[in-house]
Amino acid sequence: MKTVFAILFLTFIALTCARNYEDLKEKIKNEVEREIFEDLEEESDELENNFKKFNDAKPWTRWIRWKTIVPFIPAVIAAAGKK
């Protein structure tokens, strides 16, 4: 009789640990997903802020940027046209 109770007790402990393990695994998975989403939201906010800064530039600043890019356009077109 003692052996039966011992086996039942050990089985109960094993099932409890298995449930706890699955719960723990699920909690860890949810925590990691939540952290990933938070990081992505922060990066998205940073990108939006940088985009706003770029678009908020004064027109003459945009012209200066364009002026520095224009000389490279023929070289890019020539390189793209070669086979």
Curated annotation (Swiss-Prot):
The modification Alanine amide is found at A80. It comes from the Eukaryota. The keyword Nuclease does not apply. Expressed in entodermal epithelium along the body column. Keywords: Amidation, Antibiotic, Antimicrobial, Immunity, Innate immunity, Membrane, Secreted, Signal, Target cell membrane, Target membrane. GO terms for cellular component: extracellular region. Residues 1-18 form the signal peptide. Residues 19-57 form a propeptide. It is found in: Secreted; Target cell membrane. Antimicrobial peptide with a broad-spectrum antimicrobial activity. Keeps its antibacterial activity under a wide range of salt concentrations that mimic physiological conditions of human blood, which is surprising, since Hydra is an obligate freshwater animal with nearly no salt tolerance. Does not affect red blood cells. Belongs to the arminin family. This is Arminin 3a. It comes from Hydra vulgaris (Hydra).
